[in-house]
Amino acid sequence: MRNESERRAAARRRAEHRGRDAERRVAGWYAAQGFVVLAQRLRTAAGELDLVVADRTTLVFVEVKARNALRSAIESVAPRQRRRLVAAAAIVLAGQPDWGRAETRFDVVLLVGDDVHAIRDAFRADDP
């Protein structure tokens, strides 16, 4: 029992490390495009937002997925998770009204190996 528990804990630690590394890399990718990183791993009552970035006109809530294959990364953002991200974004905007911009979007960034695949405006707050 203990060995199984230890294996699960080790797997969680590896996943956590991989996720943090992916988020750092994606934050750098957005910064190189002129965005300012407003928050990383922002926790709300509705869930966690991996990244919140902005330029002068656009506020972007970013979900980062690191996977071994592109297909599994794309499929990893299910409708339930999208609803949670939208709810978390609403909480953030209510608490940080100065972050508001003319445009707000939700990006999903897939990190497969060293390749960054950004799906800009991957979904909208009013999507079913």
UniProtKB/Swiss-Prot annotation:
Single GO MF descriptor: nucleic acid binding
Domain of life: Bacteria
Transmembrane spans: none
Segment forming the signal sequence: none
Family indicated by similarity: Belongs to the UPF0102 family.
NCBIfam families for this protein: YraN family protein
Protein name per its UniProtKB record: UPF0102 protein Acry_2261
The species this protein was found in: Acidiphilium cryptum (strain JF-5)
Organism ancestry: Bacteria, Pseudomonadati, Pseudomonadota, Alphaproteobacteria, Acetobacterales
